[in-house]
Curated annotation (Swiss-Prot):
Annotated organism of origin: Candida glabrata (strain ATCC 2001 / BCRC 20586 / JCM 3761 / NBRC 0622 / NRRL Y-65 / CBS 138)
Lineage: Eukaryota, Fungi, Dikarya, Ascomycota, Saccharomycotina
Name this protein carries in UniProt: Repressor of RNA polymerase III transcription MAF1
Cited InterPro entries: Maf1 (IPR015257), Maf1_sf (IPR038564)
GO molecular function, one term: RNA polymerase III core binding
Function: Mediator of diverse signals that repress RNA polymerase III transcription. Inhibits the de novo assembly of TFIIIB onto DNA.
Length: 391
């Protein structure tokens, strides 16, 4: 990538470099073209290999997850089709069947029969035979069954009709329950199959279009190239560091307005009033309305290892139409550390023989002769005393 040197951009960099009472601020705007050079092509190959490794790891993870889903589905099918499960279903069915209400001994409407016999004579007996019995409900047990059969054999109704009626009711209930159970099993099987198909399709789609970070699918060349542009700019700005192993998730996409607001708020907190002409100059070279902003926000920044580092704000304005990337940054570090470095470290203040150098010395220039002396404020008896001091 080629660095673009502009005079008005240099003015922006001068304004963004200053010191406060306790901080040193290093800011600026560097503009690069996306035209690749020989070193960039080598970097692009390294980044492609790194992203291919990430993609392979993701595919292996998806394959293991798909196998686990298939095993879980097989376990569910085995549990639903196991004999123990069927016995449990049948036992629960007969338990419900046992608790169902059945007909007790049939009782005719005697008062109705009596009234009919008194009024109609022989016709009352015929009507009485046609009146259905009132059924008293109770739980099914052996005593009720014997009583029911004996009563019907005595003349209330034929045992064959009772058996046929009971058999029909039993078949109807059994068929309804079996059909309901079959529908439930079919729905469960269909739902499990649909879930498996959905999970597999999602996994396949994920493996084909894996989105890591704000750049889109990493298997597409355009997404990889955009990610490589930012890595190349960081390598050019900080040659002592290697950023080729950064992850796409170390960046995030944000709006340009929010980034400008953060930038100006940081300037306000540092006691500087933001200048509107700064963004006008950047806009003249980048056309911010056509730009996409990627903000560098890793979990652990390389600047954390720098001595005295406090915070940083780094953004990349990418204009695909103009084939340019603007690197806008604002870095803050402690100023006290710079003052201590100016004074000197203990190693720098030590002489060759191991003794420490005394910096409280003065030099006098008298006829091109260097005289070096020290201030000694201790009192000695042999010291020379002026006459004025004795008086």
């Amino acid at each position: 990538m080629k660095f673009i040197d502009e005079l008005d951009i240099e003015r922006v960099n001068q304004v963004l470099n200053f010191e406060t009472i306790d901080c040193k601020i290093v800011g600026g705007c560097d503009i690069f073209t996306t035209k690749a050079v020989a070193s960039d092509r080598k970097l692009y190959k390294t980044i492609d290999h790194h992203l291919d490794t990430i993609l392979q790891d993701n595919e292996s993870y998806n394959l293991a997850l798909q196998q686990q889903i298939a095993l879980d589905a097989e376990d569910k099918n085995e549990r639903s089709m196991s004999p123990g499960g069927q016995r449990r279903d049948s036992s629960s069915f007969w338990e419900q069947k046992r608790r169902m209400s059945v007909s007790d001994s049939p009782i005719y409407l005697q008062h109705i029969n009596g009234n009919l016999n008194e009024s109609n004579g022989a016709q009352g007996e015929i009507v009485a035979d046609l009146v259905p019995p009132i059924i008293k409900t109770s739980k099914l047990n052996d005593h009720n069954l014997k009583e029911l059969v004996s009563n019907y054999e005595a003349g209330y109704s034929s045992s064959s009709s009772v058996e046929s009626l009971t058999h029909k009711n039993k078949e109807r209930r059994t068929s309804s329950l079996s059909s309901t159970g079959g529908k439930v099993d079919k729905l469960r099987a269909d739902s499990s199959t649909a879930n498996d198909i959905t999970a597999r399709s999602v996994l396949n789609d994920t493996s084909r279009t894996l989105n890591l970070g704000p750049f889109g699918p990493i298997n597409e060349p355009s997404s990889r190239r955009t990610f490589a542009y930012l890595i190349a700019i960081l390598n050019a700005s900080y040659p002592d560091h290697d950023f080729s192993l950064l992850e796409p998730t170390d960046f995030k996409r944000s709006s340009i307005k929010s980034f400008i607001a953060k930038f100006e708020n940081s300037m306000y907190s540092l006691g500087r009033k933001p200048e509107e002409w700064i963004w006008e100059v950047i806009n003249s070279h980048m056309t911010l309305s056509d730009c996409v902003l990627y903000q560098y926000c890793p979990t652990q920044s390389f600047l954390d290892d720098e001595p005295g580092h406090l915070w940083s704000l780094i953004g990349f304005f990418f204009n695909k139409k103009r084939k340019r990337v603007a690197y806008v940054y604002l870095l803050a570090s402690r100023l006290q550390l710079a003052v201590n470095n100016a004074i000197g470290t203990p190693d720098e203040m030590q002489n060759e023989d191991g003794t420490f150098r005394n910096n409280n010395t003065t030099s006098f220039d008298n006829n091109n002769t260097q005289f070096e002396g020290e201030y000694d404020l201790t009192y000695e008896e042999n010291a020379i005393v002026d006459d004025d001091d004795e008086e």
